[in-house]
A protein has these predicted regions:
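Positively charged n-region of N-terminal signal peptides that target proteins for export
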Residues: 1-4
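Cleaved targeting-peptide boundary
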Residues: 21-27
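Active-site-adjacent structural elements in enzyme catalytic domains
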Residues: 27-39, 43-44, 49-52, 121-136
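Structural beta-sheet core signal
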Residues: 34-35, 143, 311
Length: 566
C-alpha cells in the first residue's frame, strides 16, 4: 500500500511540475503572455465548463484547467470591489488605484485606503510592465482585445489617465507608445491623424480588413474591427471579424520574431459586458472563446520553452450562480434541466436585440424558434412591443408603457433579451455590477515556477516583474524617473502653459532657457514627440509618452528632458 501511494505521489509530481513561486527564486522567461477575462467570477468559469461539456461530451475540461493554481485578491486602492481600470492597472503597474484611474496613482482617501498612499503622488502616471519591457528590455509589445482599443483594460497597459472615459486623452497615448501589435475594436476612434502617424512610423494599419490582417507580414501592425466594440463570439460573422484565438495567434506570430522577447496582453473583454447585462449565454460563450485563445498561447509556450502564460480575471461581476430559487429541487435537477436550454441559444442577448430590430414584427416568433428553440410568451411579446428600443413595434412609441424591469418591461431591448434568456435557464444573478470575491488564477511556466495559492494583485505584478528580472520596486522607481512633474524637472527654467486651441485636447507646455534663447522645448501632451528649438523645428522622440493632468495643471515627463535645455 505504501509503495502504491509513493508511486502515485511520484506520478503526480512528474505530471504537474509546479511549486509555490517565491519572487526571488523565479526563473526569468523571455516572453510573458497575460490573459485577462474581464469581469469573470468563478461561477462564470464553471458555467462555461459545464456548457462545453454538455454540448461536447468529449470535452469535459477547459484549456486552463490543468494550470489553475490559485486565486487573486483583486480590488481598488480604496474599495474591496474593483473597477476594471484600477484592477488591471495594479496587475501591470503594481500600484492599486481607484475607480476610473488608468495606470495612475490614486488620490489619498484617508481611512478608506486599503493600502497606504502618498498624497504627494496623486495623479502621477504609473509605469506599466508593458512600457518597461519595451523601454528596458528592447522587447516587442502587443495588445489583443474585443472592446474598443482605449477601453479600460488595454488602456491600462499602455496609457495613463484619471478618467477612463477620456478616450481623447487615452487613444493618442496608445498610438504614440510604440506598441508593436494592436488587434481589437475601435475603428471609429482611430483618427486620420493617428493612422497617418502609425503609417509614417512603419506600421500596417487595417480597418475592418480581415484578409489584409491575415496576409500581413509586417512586424508592426494595428488591425481594428467594428466602429467600437467587436461582436460577441457567438454573434460574430467569421467573414468579417476574427476570433480572439486567431487574433492571439497573429499577435504571437509577429511578436515572437523579436529575439529580445515580448509582452502580450490578451483580454476577453465582453465576458464583463455580458455579465453586466446578466446574459448567461454571452458570458459562457465568450469565456469559451477566451479559453480557446489561451489554448493557442499554451501550445506556443510549450513549443517555445521561453514563455510564461498567466490567466486571470480583473474582478468578478453579476453574482452569477448555477441554480436559483425558482428552480425547485436544486439537488435533483439533471444536467438537461440545468444546461439544455442554455446550449440551444444561437445568439447572445445583444445578438437577439440586433436581429429583432432588423425583421418585421410578424417574424419574431420564428426567429426565437430557430435561434433558441422556443416561442415568446404573451407577456414577453407584450414587453417587447412596449420596449422603447424596439423599432418594429405595432404600438406607437408615445403609447408604450414604462414599467419596471422586474415585471419584464425594459426600455433597453438588449436588457429585455437578457431577461428572456435567463428566464429559460436556472442561472441566477445578484447584481448588474461588479463583485468583490477573489478571481481564478492559472499559469504555465516552462520550469514550473508558478504562483500557487491565494495572491494579492500586487503580488501578481511582482511575480510578472520577476519573470523579466525586474525588482518589485522597479516600476515605481521608473515612474518617478519617466513621469516626473514638469515643475520639478524644469524648476530652473521658464515654463508657460498655453491653453488648448480649438480642436486640441490639451494645452501645450513651452519651456525656455532665459540665458540661451535658442534652447526651447515645445511639449504637447499625450504623445512621445517633443519639439526643440525656438522655431520648434527639431523633433525629440521619447520612448515614453508625456501625460497632462488638468486636475493639478501638470505635465508628467522624463527627467532627462532638461538636458536639452542645458
Amino acid at each position: 500500500m505504501k509503495k502504491t501511494l509513493s508511486l502515485l505521489l511520484l506520478l503526480t509530481l512528474i505530471l504537474i511540475p509546479a511549486r509555490a513561486a517565491d519572487v526571488q527564486d523565479v526563473k526569468p522567461t523571455k516572453n510573458v503572455i497575460l490573459f485577462i477575462s474581464d469581469g469573470t467570477s468563478l461561477a462564470t468559469v464553471s458555467t462555461a465548463r459545464w456548457l462545453q461539456w454538455y454540448s461536447h461530451p468529449d470535452k469535459p475540461n477547459l484549456n486552463i484547467d490543468p494550470y489553475i493554481c490559485g486565486t487573486v485578491r483583486t480590488h481598488s486602492s480604496n474599495a474591496p470591489i474593483g473597477d476594471s481600470a484600477p484592477t488591471t492597472s495594479c496587475y501591470v503597474s503594481g500600484q492599486p488605484s481607484q475607480t476610473g484611474f488608468v495606470s495612475t496613482y490614486p488620490v489619498n482617501c484617508g481611512n478608506d485606503d486599503i493600502y497606504p498612499t502618498d498624497p504627494n503622488r496623486a495623479y502621477q502616471p504609473t509605469m506599466t510592465l508593458l512600457e518597461a519591457v519595451k523601454m528596458f528590455k528592447g522587447g516587442s509589445t502587443g495588445l489583443v482585445f474585443t472592446c474598443e482599443f482605449p477601453h479600460a483594460t488595454p488602456a491600462d497597459c499602455s496609457a495613463h489617465s484619471y478618467n477612463r472615459g477620456k478616450y481623447e486623452w487615452i487613444a493618442p497615448q496608445m498610438v504614440h507608445n510604440n506598441l508593436d501589435v494592436v488587434i481589437g475594436g475601435g475603428v471609429s476612434i482611430l483618427s486620420d491623424d493617428m493612422e497617418k502617424y502609425l503609417k509614417d512610423n512603419g506600421y500596417s494599419v487595417y480597418r475592418n480588413d480581415l484578409k489584409g490582417m491575415r496576409a500581413d507580414t509586417n512586424n508592426k501592425m494595428w488591425a481594428l474591427y467594428a466602429d467600437r466594440e467587436m461582436s460577441y463570439d457567438l454573434d460574430r460573422n467569421p467573414d468579417e471579424q476574427p476570433s480572439l484565438e486567431e487574433m492571439t495567434k497573429k499577435a504571437i506570430e509577429k511578436l515572437s520574431k523579436n529575439d529580445k522577447g515580448f509582452f502580450l496582453m490578451v483580454e476577453g473583454s465582453k465576458v464583463d459586458w455580458a455579465a453586466h447585462a446578466n446574459d448567461p449565454v454571452g458570458m459562457a460563450t465568450d469565456f469559451l472563446a477566451f479559453d480557446r485563445a489561451v489554448g493557442a498561447a499554451l501550445e506556443f509556450a510549450k513549443q517555445n520553452g521561453e514563455t510564461t502564460v498567466i490567466v486571470t480575471a480583473d474582478h468578478g461581476n453579476s453574482g452569477i450562480s448555477i441554480g436559483r430559487e425558482s428552480c425547485k429541487g436544486y439537488d435533483k435537477l439533471t444536467k438537461d434541466q440545468l444546461f439544455k436550454n442554455l446550449s440551444q441559444f444561437k445568439l447572445t442577448a445583444e445578438g437577439f436585440a440586433k436581429k429583432v430590430n432588423t425583421i418585421p414584427n410578424s417574424e419574431v416568433q420564428s426567429l426565437f424558434r430557430e435561434q433558441a428553440g422556443f416561442e415568446l410568451t404573451k407577456e414577453e411579446l407584450d414587453a417587447l412591443n412596449n420596449c422603447k428600443d424596439y423599432k418594429f413595434s405595432p404600438i406607437p412609441e408615445a403609447e408604450r408603457h414604462e414599467k419596471s424591469q422586474a415585471s419584464m418591461y425594459s426600455n433597453s431591448l438588449s436588457g429585455l433579451m437578457s431577461q428572456i434568456i435567463t428566464s429559460r435557464t436556472c442561472m441566477g444573478f445578484t447584481t448588474h455590477g461588479h463583485t468583490g470575491e477573489e478571481v481564478f488564477l492559472a499559469s504555465y511556466h516552462p520550469q514550473g515556477d508558478r504562483p500557487m495559492g491565494m495572491h494579492t494583485n500586487i503580488e501578481l505584478n511582482h511575480y510578472m516583474c520577476s519573470l523579466y528580472g525586474f525588482e518589485p520596486s522597479f516600476l515605481s522607481d521608473m515612474s518617478n524617473k519617466y513621469f516626473a512633474r514638469h515643475t520639478d524637472v524644469f524648476q530652473d527654467y521658464t515654463c508657460e502653459i498655453i491653453p488648448a486651441k480649438e480642436g486640441e485636447v490639451a494645452p501645450t507646455l513651452i519651456v525656455k532657457n532665459k540665458k540661451d534663447k535658442k534652447k526651447q522645448l515645445t511639449i504637447h501632451a499625450f504623445t512621445n514627440v517633443v519639439k526643440a528649438g525656438k522655431k520648434a523645428d527639431q523633433d525629440i522622440i521619447l520612448n515614453s509618452v508625456v501625460v497632462y493632468v488638468d486636475k493639478n495643471n501638470t505635465f508628467y515627463l522624463p527627467e532627462s528632458l532638461v538636458d536639452f535645455l542645458k
